[in-house]
Regions:
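Catalytic domains of riboflavin
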Residues: 1-231
Length: 231
């Protein structure tokens, strides 16, 4: 338990300092490691590192109360609604994922001052500026969002469940919960870690080696779940 508390404390300190944290969800779920960093600290070199060392999709996970105020909805609901016009879209949303629940994807955005939106610089700007929207959500943030962003774009937004870990144990909820523990804006950039040798998700052992090499805290979902229960 002491080791878990130390690991959690290290992860919180790293996020506060604008450094990466690696988050493992659960071997019975996706069993994947995400490289994450608080949105308010994102710089272009962070996106470059996520792109090169993680290799998955760079997304922005945001707390539910913020996405609700912005009027954002889950992509699977948008697609299902399109099924009223074209029944094929209803088929696309049938069933659940192999790991058990629906994805947390919403729309993908670009900041209006970006060019293509996909470069490290552009994605970092979009994420950082979206963190400002989240910070100002009750003070002009909604208008700021509508005025300064466009969709579709290159930064997918992930909507966290309302009660976070009490509703869902995905990386979206785990990472937004981590921002709350760190007293940061509840918006966090996340990217799955891939293995170019096996062409699968990076194993926990390989992630531990990477974390040790670069001095990055690696935290497991069980530690966050235990903390949430104790709170």
């Amino acid at each position: 338990m002491a080791e878990s508390l130390l690991s959690l404390a290290e992860a919180i300190a790293a996020l506060k300092a604008g450094r990466f944290v690696l988050v493992h969800d659960d071997k019975t779920r996706e069993n994947e490691i995400d490289m994450v960093i608080a949105a308010e600290h994102v710089k272009p070199y962070h996106i470059a590192t996520m792109r090169k060392d993680a290799g998955g999709l760079v997304c922005l996970a945001i707390a539910n109360y913020i996405t609700s105020k912005l009027g954002l909805v889950y992509m699977h609901d948008i697609i299902a609604d399109m099924g009223k016009v074209n029944p094929i879209f209803l088929k696309l949303t049938e069933g659940r994922t192999t790991y058990g629940d629906k994805p947390s994807f919403s729309i993908a955005i670009n900041h209006r001052s970006t060019y293509t939106g996909v470069t490290d610089q552009d994605r970092a700007l979009t994420i950082y500026k979206m963190a400002e929207v989240c910070k100002n959500i009750d003070n002009g943030g909604v208008e700021q969002f509508a005025r300064n962003f466009r969709a579709p774009g290159h930064v997918p937004i992930l909507i966290a469940s309302k009660r976070l870990l009490h509703d869902r144990m995905g990386h979206t909820e785990l990472c937004v919960y981590l921002t709350q523990l760190a007293d940061l804006i509840p918006a966090i950039a996340i990217c799955e870690m891939m293995d170019s040798a096996t062409h699968k998700a990076l194993s926990v052992d390989a992630a531990q080696e990477y974390a040790s090499k670069f001095g990055i805290p690696l935290i497991d979902a069980s530690e966050l779940k235990a903390n949430a229960k104790a709170a």
